[in-house]
């Protein structure tokens, strides 16, 4: 079955199997993961899912892991796919400096402790229309390693001379307490590398970047992060999908637009891994559910970014291997799959008996069990 068609089926029909699974997730995606667990449980009466917080339930086993860059799931993996994106932003705590323009070279100097005042002459030259104050620069040194790495990859790629390595003023710190970080950012003059979701959810000020001379500056926005996401290319090996940003590819304009937003290319991916074991089929069903387009909307709702369609479709195809294909129940449901998703695939692959006409009623999500389960 073509991956695109399988993704359409995953969107319209919830695949249900019997089982009981625990899903381990990173703290920042706790609410997103809980929404997926709740949605799957509501649709599948014989599948029970729960969320495990590894920092709290240290010894609790898990059947599915959702991890951040640099983290390795503690299991024998049988399938994996990117499941969402969080960009990396540079926050500034100086009134009136939202969007203040930096070059990679000046940002490197600031994060290395070489820019001591927000009235720096080079910064003023880059921002002639902003009245800068002589506020001391306070560098928040503690930075998550994945955030430093993502920003470093982007900055060094566009200006290797001005950004030769991770700035010396930063200290790798994997711990990240949101309340503590927010409190530290209240100090006037602070500059810090933080997740873009933190910026979005707390309305923080951020800098913009001049990626090339005489080119419009790039801001970290929903549109610019989505634009960068369209430059990601999926690679599939069996049930495993990885994705990497290819900066040589032109970003794809959003629907209804002729021109794509300038991409903000400091990105981190979250990866979803299904573990081998007695619950692996249920784990695959959860992964498939999380990669549905409707389910991906939870990422956006909580300040993150959903995977680009090309990567998402590849992920659905990979994690679905071995799962029963959704079929239409013999009663209480439309008799034929809508024309728009059955054009290239014979009807008998997705329906149990031929029909002479398409029902006039809207198609509801149904499960592949003998009788329809309510969906949400």
Which residues does each PLM region occupy?
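Flexible loop/hinge segments at secondary-structure junctions
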Residues: 1-338
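Ser/Thr-rich, Proline-interspersed low-complexity disordered segments
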Residues: 2-3, 327, 331, 335, ...
């Amino acid at each position: 079955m073509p991956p695109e068609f399988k993704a359409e089926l995953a969107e319209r029909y919830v695949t249900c199997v019997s089982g009981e699974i625990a899903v381990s997730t990173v703290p920042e995606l706790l609410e997103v993961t809980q929404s997926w667990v709740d949605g799957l449980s509501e649709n599948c009466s014989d599948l029970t899912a729960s969320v495990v917080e590894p920092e709290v339930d240290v010894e609790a086993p898990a059947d599915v892991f959702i991890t951040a860059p640099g983290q390795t799931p503690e299991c024998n993996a049988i399938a994996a796919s990117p499941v969402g994106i969080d960009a990396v932003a540079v926050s500034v705590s100086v009134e009136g400096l939202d969007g203040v323009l930096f070059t990679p070279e000046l940002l490197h100097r600031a994060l290395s402790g070489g820019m001591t005042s927000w009235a720096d002459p080079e910064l003023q030259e880059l921002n002639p229309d902003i009245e800068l104050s002589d506020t001391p620069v306070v560098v928040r040194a503690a930075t998550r390693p994945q955030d430093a790495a993502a920003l470093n990859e982007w900055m060094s790629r566009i200006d290797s001379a001005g950004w030769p390595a991770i700035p010396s003023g930063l200290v790798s710190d994997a711990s990240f307490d949101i309340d503590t970080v927010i409190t530290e950012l209240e100090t006037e003059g602070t500059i810090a590398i933080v997740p873009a979701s933190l910026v979005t959810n707390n309305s923080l000020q951020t800098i913009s970047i001049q990626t090339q001379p005489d080119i419009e500056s790039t801001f970290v926005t929903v549109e610019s992060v989505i634009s960068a996401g369209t430059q990601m290319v999926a690679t599939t090996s069996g049930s495993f999908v990885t994705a990497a940003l290819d900066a040589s590819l032109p970003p794809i304009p959003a629907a209804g637009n002729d021109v794509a937003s300038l991409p903000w290319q400091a990105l981190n991916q979250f990866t979803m891994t299904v573990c081998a074991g007695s619950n692996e089929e249920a784990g695959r069903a959860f992964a498939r559910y999380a990669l549905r387009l409707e389910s991906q909307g939870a990422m956006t709702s909580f300040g993150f970014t959903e995977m680009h369609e090309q990567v998402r479709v590849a992920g659905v195809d990979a994690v679905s291997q071995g799962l029963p294909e959704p079929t239409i129940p013999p009663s209480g449901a439309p008799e034929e799959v809508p024309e728009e998703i059955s054009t290239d695939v014979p009807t008998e692959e997705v329906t149990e008996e031929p029909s002479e006409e398409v029902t006039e009623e809207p198609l509801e999500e149904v499960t592949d069990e003998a009788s329809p389960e309510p969906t949400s």
